[in-house]
Amino acid sequence: MITKTYKDISEEKFYKLYFDLVNVLKPTDQITYTESLVLIEFLLLKEEKYKHARFAARAKREVIKILQEKYDKKVSMTYMAVILANLESKGWIEKEPDGIKYFNKKHQAVVDRILTSNDYEEIIFKLKVKQNNEH
């Protein structure tokens, strides 16, 4: 068995690890490096004003500013719209009937469980190799 324990990592580092793990499980629609940077910054916005407007114009402007300051990445509103459309088409962002966009609910449930736990949480991969008698 292979195990790896992460102790007291930042929320940002957690998201990076989580996206990397999910990419291992998904043969298609994997999140790219730039998409993950952008999505992480949206998810790190904690103010109440972003709770139900996580991907709205105000949040987009804030994330663009953060990307410039933190990574020296210049992202236009047009390019931001393309990145968010890609994340939506890949299932990372979901649009509710009321038109509001949210982080995928299944991923959010896993993330919330891990982020609010006082103990270690496990993410388990189970593998079974097909037995083939032919070479």
Tell me what each language-model feature is.
Residues 1-9:
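General nucleic-acid-binding
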Residues 8-51:
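Short alpha-helical segments that sit at the start of domains
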Residues 49-70:
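Short acidic, hydrophobic short linear motifs in intrinsically disordered regions
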Residues 72-90:
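Short amphipathic alpha-helical interaction segments
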Residues 85-101:
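A short, conserved structural fragment
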Residues 108-135:
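Short, amphipathic alpha-helical interaction segments positioned at domain boundaries
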